[in-house]
Amino acid sequence: MLTELGPVIRTRPTLAVWKFASCDGCQLTLLDCENELLGLTDRIRVDHFLEMTPAEGAEGGRARLEGRGPYDLSLVEGSITTAGDAERIQHVRRISRALVTIGACATAGGVQALRNFADVDDFIAAVYARPEYIAALETSTPISAHVPVDFELRGCPIDRRQLIEVITAYLAGRTPQIPDHSVCFECKRRGTTCITVAHGTPCLGPVTHAGCGAICPAYGRGCYGCFGPSSRPNLRSMVAQLRRDGMSERDIQRVFRTFNAASPEYASVSDLAAEEQQSPPA
């Protein structure tokens, strides 16, 4: 827990940002926090962040990629998809006092976790002209499957206000105030009419973690789960509602296999649907 690792550091704590298999969107969210970061520069020092530093030669680039450490707080983006990733995250954990995973890839495997439901060699053969040059693991897994994680920040991409809250909370030695309720709460707070009740639009809001501000429902589009499962989601009821809204079994499976495909809750939807189809009617 971050509260147990809160800074008892007399000098400025050091921050490191790491990339694994991802699109860099969550790192860009940190760079987008321009004014907020300026306000924190006297309290924390960014020591390792490839996205915001100039390129170097091969030797310097390798050293910067691996990082020297130790670091007080590491933010890790991306999932583990190669043997090299699996080895490097162990190194990152060893040189990090606190480790926070940021984004759907790091917390739930990302879209690349679609390989978990198929044969990765089939994907490689379909995409690459020379598949023999590609070395990838059979699955894409979150960081927590490989090393202990002190806090997870969800989203695709993460919310900038939540990111600043995590950094500020670490500096203050307290638990980050990140809500664990569903997107439905955010719709009510901003006065958005429920699009499922009013229009029959399929929406994952009831089982999706809050954090986006309910942007999609505000524009008449159903939530598609980019922040991953909420706390204790009722997936059985959600699947039943999606059926009533006219979604096919294949589309129900697809809607849960997007940004957070490897989350245990969303990954179980296929088994849940099969179980219900085999059950005799009440």
Task: Label each PLM-derived region with a short phrase.
Residues 113:
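Short aromatic-enriched loop/helix-cap "lid" or pocket-rim segments at secondary-structure transitions
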Residues 105-110:
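Short gly/pro/ser/thr-enriched loop/turn and capping motifs at secondary-structure boundaries
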Residues 116-120:
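Short, hinge-like loop/turn segments at secondary-structure boundaries
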Residues 78-80, 104:
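Short glycine-/small-residue-rich Rossmann-like dinucleotide-binding loops
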Residues 101:
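Catalytic or ion-translocation cores adjacent to nucleophile or general acid/base/metal-coordination motifs
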Residues 83:
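Short substrate-entry loop that stabilizes the transition state in hydrolases
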Residues 1-75, 86, 90-98, 121-282:
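Iron-sulfur (Fe-S) cluster-binding modules
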